[in-house]
Amino acid sequence: MVTTRIQVKEYLKEYLLGKYNDGVDGPLRIPPSSDLYELCYNLVGKRPVSAGPDSGNVELVLRNRTSCKDPRVYNWFCPRHQLLIERKVKLMMRAEFHDFVDLHHHRYGMTYVDAIAEFMNRFGIVSLSEETLVKDYQRYRNRVRPHEKRYYKKCNDK
């Protein structure tokens, strides 16, 4: 089993561990059917001679696919590729978060705050506050379903 480390923001680490490792801290095994797995496989490269040891807060397990890239040789992500992976994880988290809150609010009748708290508990996210996620959801909701300003006519029936 070959592993490598990447640096991502703390709340994204918590999301990844909650999604793929059931909240257990340890090497992260991304399923091969995931888009994130394909992205990581496409971005992994040979370790340069000048590269130091891996540093980061997320340890990824690199699986051996039958074609091309042997993980014993291809086991390094440059800083630019780490940023691309971080952006992809952030996009995945936000999409799942918005879908989760919409589903729980409209289908199960939960309030937005309760649905957000449930999302945080399910994925073990503690480095973000609920207010941050509430504000993010409000921005998303206003962008997707903007409110129309209602114009009232003044009525002088007296």
Task: Label each PLM-derived region with a short phrase.
Residues D136-Y151:
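Short, basic alpha-helical nucleic acid-contact segments in DNA-binding proteins
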Residues D102-F123:
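Short, charged amphipathic recognition helices of the HTH superfamily
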Residues M1-C78:
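Long, low-complexity interaction regions most often at the N-terminus
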Residues E86-Y108:
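Positively charged, polyanion-binding regions of nucleic-acid-associated proteins
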Residues E118-V134:
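Short, basic interhelical loop/turn and adjoining N-cap
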Residues R150-K158:
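Intrinsically disordered, low-complexity basic tails/linkers immediately adjacent to helix-turn-helix/homeobox/MYB/SANT
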